[in-house]
Regions:
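The feature captures the ABC ATPase H-loop/switch
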Residues: 113
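Active-site-proximal beta-strand elements of phosphoester/diester hydrolases
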Residues: 222-225
Length: 284
């Protein structure tokens, strides 16, 4: 029997109850596209991932709690910031480091897109209501004043798209979707502020907020601010999952022993150190 591409997924974390949770929509979208989802545990022991990562052909970083502002050099001054999930954040940083090093396909959804940007050195608006509208009114978006303000946390059911995004036609995402404008759902109060120097913005909301990013010089490392898993089976956006699985299948066939590594993790040193130091040593 042909082996299905395995997609590692990070669960949501409830630090108070010491629980993880996982919406089945993500797994359903991966299965429908022809992949096999694998829910990853949250562990501070890197040897767990030395065993698991060689089995994995691609990753999905899902939605969830806000990222700790300290990870991108900001202060924790907003009462609107969710509970932080340090174990999850450090697993996602490990995954991104691994996928970046070995060019494994990875898709970030909502918070997952924000995590790609943060892990690669970008920053976030900690709360769009407090920060982003004022920035728009000052005209930082290509010098345009008076851009429309959107409800980025929609009141309608999440299975209903509520606002348009414009996609750069020459981007990977634009070529996948085959359209320049598409309607999406929206359920977030944070967003990309300063882009990582290794990331390109490839889609925007009408108010100028970044809605999709791609990591430069990587085969398939894409983030979207919306939730395409709500549209599986009835929307053009499911082709993004199809493309992820296709890229993962190619990686499984052609990447050989890229995953056989020893992972070394050391604690951050110094006040400016925002992430643990991760190194990968090839097994011989």
């Amino acid at each position: 029997m042909k082996r299905l591409p395995v997609i590692g997924i990070v669960p949501s974390q409830n630090t108070t109850e010491k629980m993880v949770s996982f919406p089945e929509r993500y797994a359903d979208a991966i299965i429908k596209a022809g992949g096999a989802p694998l829910l990853l545990p949250l562990s501070g022991n890197p040897h767990i991932y030395e065993t698991l990562f060689p089995l994995i052909d691609g990753f999905v970083l899902t939605g969830g709690n806000d990222i700790d502002p300290a990870r991108y050099g900001a202060i924790r001054d907003s009462g609107k910031i969710d509970e932080h999930t340090p174990e999850r954040e450090e697993l996602e940083y490990l995954i991104l480091s691994y996928a970046y090093r070995f060019d494994l396909p990875l898709m970030g959804i909502c918070r997952g897109m924000q995590m790609i940007n943060v892990c690669l050195g970008g920053t976030l608006f900690r709360d769009l209501g407090d920060q982003f509208p004022g920035m728009v009114r000052k005209g930082i978006n290509d010098g345009k004043d008076g851009l429309p303000q959107l409800a980025h946390w929609q009141p309608k059911p999440y299975s209903e798209p509520t606002h348009p995004v414009t996609i750069l036609p020459n981007s990977k995402l634009g070529k996948l979707l085959g359209v320049q404008d598409i309607m999406v759902n929206s359920m977030h109060h944070q967003g990309v502020c300063d882009l990582s120097t290794r990331v390109d913005a490839v889609a925007y909301a009408p108010d100028g907020l970044v809605e999709a990013i791609e990591v430069r010089d990587k085969s398939f490392m894409i983030g979207v601010q919306w939730h395409p898993e709500f549209f599986t089976g009835r929307h053009r956006m499911e082709c993004v999952f199809d493309a992820l699985i296709e890229a993962a299948a190619h990686c499984h066939t052609h990447c050989g022993e890229r995953g056989s590594v020893v992972i070394t993790r050391s604690e951050p040193v110094g006040i400016q150190a925002q992430w643990p130091e991760i190194t990968f040593a090839d097994c011989i």
